[in-house]
């Protein structure tokens, strides 16, 4: 149902877009005011009788009349606006645009032998089933504070992150969502912040079955996993798609914090060469499962290690072989680091990853990997803050030749944003330890200070 800007005016309905009048702006079509503050769902309390305009026409005329009144039909959940009554049909109309007979295209209707005698108002019983989840919750939850603004769907699970003032209503919210959302069997609430080793959500079951093994699709790719034991955020699907679209067949992807594979599996399906890693044994198990399910095992190697260990072992070995034995100008090499709470802390693992001798014979036109690291930033100028975080942990400044972009991903909380910082690794980064670079910079600053003092004397 689309929102109409002015309910008091008759609205022109285009053939391309089907706009209907918003029922929640019409008091008569709202749930009873008596349900406000309800904490235990009582579906029978939502019953009410309303009067709505109607046309009653012979059955033989319905097909000719419907195109004339289609834009005025009363649209509600589980309500058929055209109903059989004896040998005729009752067409229920929306009370906002239709106040009386003259609100309708009377001349066109009269040509079909429908006149004012066919128009009247009828009693209509509305029930819990006739309102959407949003309409039910809007009528129940307190008006003085923000209601339920969003939730995530992962397969048959609805995942909430309720604020404190909504916790007394959590059972009701869970029941309403399970009732109203298609194929929803389980409703959970985020019980605490993500602070465990494996960075997965701590969940509280508030309604439905304690079944957390889900099947879902992201950007056309099927995934299966236990939502209670791994990290999965459907709000990142667009970002996953952005990265995968950057990749071409035969490109290389090193996925340091792969999870169950939202970057790695689509990349492997595109016939990229993928090395994927995750510390969580459950994520690793489902990563393997999803690779097998999507028939991309030949294109992906998987490991179950700490991200730093993966960088200094698998990534180091594979990248060295590619840099030394292949033409890196013919394909792209990408490194994804999607662990925004701490991924930047792993950037120093790239510093001094190789000795100068190991990379001494590389051609001058060698193409080094592009790193896509995700991070949270909290404050006023979050874009600048996230750049500083990356440069500080990397121990290097990112000039215009190295920095590929700082891209906003999503707002997480007030003044807290998630970003992707994309940058090129360089020969200097890969062959110089972070501590050496910092010492060199400090020494240069001290030399400059001494020189300045000498000039002043």
Curated annotation (Swiss-Prot):
Function: Specifically methylates the N1 position of guanosine-37 in various cytoplasmic and mitochondrial tRNAs. Methylation is not dependent on the nature of the nucleoside 5' of the target nucleoside. This is the first step in the biosynthesis of wybutosine (yW), a modified base adjacent to the anticodon of tRNAs and required for accurate decoding.
Annotated GO MF terms: tRNA (guanine(37)-N1)-methyltransferase activity; tRNA methyltransferase activity
Biological processes per GO annotation: mitochondrial tRNA methylation; tRNA N1-guanine methylation
Assigned GO CC terms: cytoplasm; mitochondrial matrix; nucleus
Catalysed reaction equations from the record: guanosine(37) in tRNA + S-adenosyl-L-methionine = N(1)-methylguanosine(37) in tRNA + S-adenosyl-L-homocysteine + H(+)
Enzyme Commission number: 2.1.1.228
Primary location group: mitochondrion
Taxonomic superkingdom: Eukaryota
Keyword Repeat attached: no
Record's protein name: tRNA (guanine(37)-N(1))-methyltransferase
């Amino acid at each position: 149902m689309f929102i109409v800007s002015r309910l008091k005016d008759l609205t022109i309905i285009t053939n391309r877009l089907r706009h209907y009048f918003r029922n929640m702006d019409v008091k008569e079509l709202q749930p009873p005011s008596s349900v406000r503050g309800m904490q235990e769902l009582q579906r029978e309390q939502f019953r009410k009788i309303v009067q709505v305009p109607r046309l009653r026409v012979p059955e033989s005329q319905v097909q000719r009349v419907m195109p004339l009144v289609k834009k005025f039909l009363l649209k509600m959940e589980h309500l058929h606006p055209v109903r059989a009554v004896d040998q005729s049909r009752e067409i229920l109309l929306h009370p906002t645009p239709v106040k009386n007979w003259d609100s309708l295209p009377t001349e066109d209707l009269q040509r079909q032998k429908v006149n004012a005698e066919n128009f009247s108002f009828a009693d209509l019983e509305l029930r819990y089933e006739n309102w959407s989840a949003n309409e039910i919750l809007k009528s129940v939850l307190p008006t003085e504070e923000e209601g339920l603004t969003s939730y995530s769907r992962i397969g048959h699970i609805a995942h909430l992150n309720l604020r404190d003032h909504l916790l007394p209503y959590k059972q009701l919210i869970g029941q309403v969502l399970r009732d109203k959302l298609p194929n929803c069997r389980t409703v959970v609430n985020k019980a605490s912040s993500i602070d465990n080793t494996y960075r997965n959500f701590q969940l509280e079951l508030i309604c439905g079955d304690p079944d957390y093994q889900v099947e879902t699709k992201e950007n056309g790719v099927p995934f299966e996993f236990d939502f209670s034991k791994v990290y999965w955020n459907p709000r990142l699907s667009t970002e996953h798609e952005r990265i995968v679209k950057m990749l071409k067949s035969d490109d290389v992807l090193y996925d340091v914090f792969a999870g169950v594979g939202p970057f790695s599996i689509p990349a492997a399906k595109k016939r990229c060469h993928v090395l994927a890693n995750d510390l969580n044994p459950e994520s690793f198990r489902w990563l393997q499962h999803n690779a097998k399910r999507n028939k991309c095992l030949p294109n992906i190697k998987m490991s179950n290690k700490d991200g730093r260990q993966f960088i200094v072992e698998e990534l180091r070995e594979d990248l060295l072989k590619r840099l030394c034995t292949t033409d890196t100008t013919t394909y792209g090499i990408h490194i994804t680091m999607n662990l925004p709470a701490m991924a930047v802390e792993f950037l120093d693992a790239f510093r001094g990853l190789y000795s100068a001798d190991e990379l001494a014979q590389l051609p001058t036109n060698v193409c080094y990997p592009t790193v896509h690291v995700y991070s949270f930033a909290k404050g006023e100028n979050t874009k600048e803050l996230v750049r500083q975080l990356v440069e500080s942990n990397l121990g290097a400044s990112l000039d215009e030749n190295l920095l590929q972009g700082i891209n906003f991903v999503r707002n997480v909380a007030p003044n807290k944003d998630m970003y992707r910082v994309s940058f090129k690794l360089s020969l200097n980064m890969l062959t110089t330890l972070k501590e050496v670079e910092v010492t060199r910079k400090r020494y240069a600053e001290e030399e400059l200070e001494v020189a300045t003092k000498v000039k002043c004397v």
